[in-house]
């Protein structure tokens, strides 16, 4: 089964590297399409533009210039470079006819060469067989497609550390693949919200995602849990950063993400 996310990342090829779809509010965030979902749709377009399944995405950067609304989505892609081991694709992303984002992705053939791992997975308890998920209070529709189990910090505002995380279990997402990773990386309530006692919406300025494992994996089934670990260095000058590590239940690093958010004053 392709899963709901892959269905909602499907695009129509209009020719000359142009891909389009009509987006609804299934993957909705704070008054606009969820940033991780937009990144997934952009990656879907760039992957199709490259046209070779052996060339897996290794890194993707996206800058958000204005909100992405439901309705017409358009990606104008360009294969910037093709090589023996690396390929680069860019995309100009439009929402309702306006330029709303820019994306650049690097693709490469997975090679096991000179490997080592120095980052250790979080030593947190797995999801219990009868454990109930914790529902967030943000009212973000995208959260309805996941069950979340906090392990580091809580979903409460104020009084906490800028380090949060826990298990994420998709309900109807489909396989945890390269399209799912940007959504999962952007899913958890931001670590900064744990520090702020008063609500201050923070929206994505840019997101960079590094894919650190071949995907999908047999040990990460569609309904299986992955662990997200989020840290924020600081909220400074009206912008707040966030680093995210995504781990499999077996302790393998699946992806890393970093983003900067614009903090709105209320």
How would you describe each model-predicted region?
Residues 1-266:
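Terminal targeting signals and extreme-terminal segments of soluble enzymes
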């Amino acid at each position: 089964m392709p899963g709901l996310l892959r269905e909602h990342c499907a695009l129509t090829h209009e020719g000359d590297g142009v891909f389009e779809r009509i987006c609804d509010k299934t993957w909705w965030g704070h008054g606009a399409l969820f940033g991780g979902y937009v990144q997934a749709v952009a990656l879907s377009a760039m992957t199709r533009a490259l046209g070779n399944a052996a060339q897996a995405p290794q890194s993707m950067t996206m800058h958000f210039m204005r909100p992405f609304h439901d309705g017409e989505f358009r990606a104008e892609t360009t294969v910037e470079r093709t090589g023996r081991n690396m390929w680069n694709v860019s995309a100009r992303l439009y929402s309702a006819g306006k330029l709303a984002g820019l994306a650049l992705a690097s693709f490469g053939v997975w090679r096991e060469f000179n490997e080592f791992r120095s980052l250790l997975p979080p030593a947190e308890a797995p999801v219990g067989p009868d454990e109930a998920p914790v529902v967030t209070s943000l009212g973000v529709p995208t959260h309805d497609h996941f069950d979340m189990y906090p392990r580091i910090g809580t979903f409460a505002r104020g009084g906490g550390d800028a380090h949060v995380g826990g298990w994420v279990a998709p309900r109807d997402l489909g396989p945890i693949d390269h399209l799912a990773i940007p959504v999962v990386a952007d899913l958890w309530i931001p670590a900064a919200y744990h520090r702020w006692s008063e609500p201050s919406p923070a929206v994505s300025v840019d997101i960079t995602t590094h894919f650190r494992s071949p995907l999908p994996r047999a040990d990460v089934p569609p309904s299986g849990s992955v662990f997200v670990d989020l840290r924020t260095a600081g909220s400074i000058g009206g912008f707040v950063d966030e680093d995210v590590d995504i781990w499999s239940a077996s302790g393998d690093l699946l992806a890393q993400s970093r983003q900067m958010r614009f903090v709105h004053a209320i």
